[in-house]
């Protein structure tokens, strides 16, 4: 049993198994993006090419399927509470579709301006999306005068 009023910093794939239904007030997560190197889906070469080719991934849970963890996120979140999920343009549509299939209400997307550019093969990105979802009935958000960027 997880102690009440606690902030949990751990592997959600493991920790969520110990959580009761409707027991979490807020979920804020930044799942691993399906990348192998340099912000791309496939191996693009460079310094990490050999190391990544041997391991096949950069992140420990690179192969984690959103269909496996999103229903659990919905299960543990209390009704009326919010879920924020960081993602990039590659995962955006998949996260939106699966979250709404699980029962989440999509509120809006926020922009995380990182103030620095991330290297890639095309245009350099300096932002990521934060998807804002709600489970169940509306709950007031404090300080709505804050910009969404």
Predicted ranges, named:
Residues 1-149:
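Core catalytic lobe of class I
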């Amino acid at each position: 049993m997880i102690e009440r009023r606690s902030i949990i910093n751990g592997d959600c794939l493991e920790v969520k198994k110990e959580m009761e239904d409707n027991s979490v007030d807020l979920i804020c997560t930044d799942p691993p993006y399906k990348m192998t190197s340099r912000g791309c889906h496939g191996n693009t070469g460079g310094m990490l090419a050999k190391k990544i080719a041997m391991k096949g991934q950069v992140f420990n849970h690179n192969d984690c399927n959103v269909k496996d963890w999103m229903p659990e996120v919905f299960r543990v979140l209390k009704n009326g509470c919010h879920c924020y999920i960081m993602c990039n343009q590659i995962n955006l549509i998949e996260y939106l579709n699966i979250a709404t299939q699980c029962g989440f209400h999509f509120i809006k997307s926020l922009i995380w301006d990182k103030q620095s550019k991330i290297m890639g093969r095309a245009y350099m990105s300096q932002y990521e999306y934060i998807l804002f979802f709600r489970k169940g009935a509306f709950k007031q958000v404090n300080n709505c005068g804050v910009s969404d960027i």
